[in-house]
Amino acid sequence: MENKETTTTTTTTNNGSDKKKRSLKIDLHTHILPKNWPNLKEKYGYGGWVSLDHHCSCKAKMMIDGKFFREIDSNCWDPDVRIQELNRDDVDIQVLSTVPVMFGYWAKPQDALDLAQYLNDHIAQVVSENPKRFIGLGSLPMQCTESSIQELRRCILELGLPGIQIGSNVNGKNLDDPSLFPIFEECEKLGAAVFIHPWEMVGKDRMPQYWLPWLVGMPAETCLAICSMIFGGVFQRLPNLKVCFAHGGGSFPFTIGRIEHGFNARPDLCAVVNPINPREYIGKFWVDSLVHDEEALKFLVNLMGEKKVTLGTDYPFPLGELVPGQLIESIKEFSETTKENLLGGNALEFLGLDPNKYL
């Protein structure tokens, strides 16, 4: 059944009259934190952890070992504020995941597991209180294979989350590292969706200024993650693994020609694990729509296919799309069916969820 038929809903105006039917709008890429959490330095006995300084009623400073990292607004922790903004922007559902700085891959595995459980329980609670507006993705202590599989099973089988968010590397280990494969294998077995967000960006020591880790490092880091999974045979060995990469797949879609040419020119260097041309994997994974440019998004949809790009805004952060779906909706060349796929249908397919649950 086509997404156009299964994701259409009727919205209602303030006076109760029905507006024109439209498809579900689902933002796959949003971040949330608890309003408070324990003092992790005291709890675990060492530093490096994030804390929140609620210095006024609607803002908080994210601090790492007493040093300022980022200021956030109440929409980063308050579901009621988020719902107000969802209604304002005609967004039906947000998919919630933690802020990547909370991954804790550098920490002792038992502590990273404890924090992941705390964050996952929080997301599951937010979803349970607003099940028509929120869907949750869990976090894993990826530095420990056994603990990750344990928490993955809890997320999917006990908390009812449809998937997880992970970083683009784990303490410098690329995503083809053998220690990570059993986690991906379990994800495929459980049907769990895997959203991959860049963090600990490659080359960040050379990017001390101009916000370059976010502007240049993140797209490069995501491309590195995709190539690692392709060349390292993860997609080859796990053909049913569901993966979506943030930020439109980073620089990968725009350098696939170079990647393919290198594979063909030097198979002795590129095809040492997986003999399949990397272009063959286009359309085998998803990317979000967060590219900030009309021509880039048209190229991305044409390359990946209209069923493999899904709305993602990076809400509530300023580098995201500030009006969710505005770019998709503004492109005249996209048919209504294409827009419906991009705005919601593709997210539901990636997550393995029945649209009727949200109508």
UniProtKB/Swiss-Prot annotation:
PANTHER family: 2-AMINO-3-CARBOXYLMUCONATE-6-SEMIALDEHYDE DECARBOXYLASE, 2-AMINO-3-CARBOXYMUCONATE-6-SEMIALDEHYDE DECARBOXYLASE. This is 2-amino-3-carboxymuconate-6-semialdehyde decarboxylase. The gene is acmsd. It comes from the Eukaryota. It is an enzyme of class 4 (lyase). One of its GO terms (cellular component) is cytoplasm. InterPro entries: ACMSD, Amidohydro-rel, Metal_Hydrolase. Substrate binds at R70. Monomer. Pathway: Secondary metabolite metabolism; quinolate metabolism. GO terms for biological process: negative regulation of quinolinate biosynthetic process; secondary metabolic process. Belongs to the metallo-dependent hydrolases superfamily. ACMSD family. Residues 1-21 are annotated as: Disordered.
